[in-house]
Amino acid sequence: MRIFITGMPGVGKTTLALKIAEKLKELGYKVGGFITKEIRDGGKRVGFKIITLDTNEETILAYVGDGKIKVGKYAVFIENLDNVGVEAIKRALKDADIIIIDELGAMEFKSRKFSEVVDEVIKSDKPLLATLHRNWVNKFKDKGELYTLTIENREKLFEEILNKILAGLK
C-alpha cells in the first residue's frame, strides 16, 4: 500500500500527514519517517525543519541564504537530511507498521542517500504515506494511489485516507 498526497503549497499536506500519524499512534500502530514543518520569522517563511515521527528529533532541512546546495532562495543542509531524515526512514523500514515521508520534493532529492532510501521503501512491502511536491507527481503517480488535496476536500480525504490505511494495516 502506497499513498501519495499532492496539492498546492499551504493546502495542508503536512497537517494531513501529521493528523494521520497521530491517529495511527493513538490506535497503537508504530509510525516511522518524518514530517517537514516551516520555520517562520515575523510571519515570513525562512526555512524548513524535519521532525522524526518515532523520536521527535528535529533538524534544519533548509534556510534562506547562501549554501553549497540551493533550491530557490533556500540553502539545503543535506547532512541534516541524511543524518536525521534518512536514518528515520531506515529505522521505519525495520521497525514501523507504516512509513510517513513529508515530503518528496526538490530539496529532499538533492540527497543521494534520500533517493536511495526512497527507492528501497518503494520496493518494499512496507505501507507508505508520502506527501509529494506537485512537480514530482509524474515520477510517483504510477507507484501508488495519488490524492490531490484541496481546501474543499481535506476533511473528507483525512477520513478516506485514514480508513484506507487502517484497512491495509489489519
Swiss-Prot record:
The entry's keywords: ATP-binding, Hydrolase, Nucleotide-binding
Matching InterPro entries: AAA+_ATPase, Nuc-triphosphatase_THEP1, P-loop_NTPase
Catalytic activity: a ribonucleoside 5'-triphosphate + H2O = a ribonucleoside 5'-diphosphate + phosphate + H(+)
Residues that hold ATP according to the record: 7-14, 98-105
Coiled coil (UniProt feature): none
Pfam families: NTPase_1
Key word Transport present: no
Record keyword Hydrolase present: yes
Molecular-function GO term, any one: ATP binding
E.C. numbers: 3.6.1.15
Similarity remark: Belongs to the THEP1 NTPase family.
The protein's role, per its UniProt record: Has nucleotide phosphatase activity towards ATP, GTP, CTP, TTP and UTP. May hydrolyze nucleoside diphosphates with lower efficiency.
Name this protein carries in UniProt: Nucleoside-triphosphatase THEP1
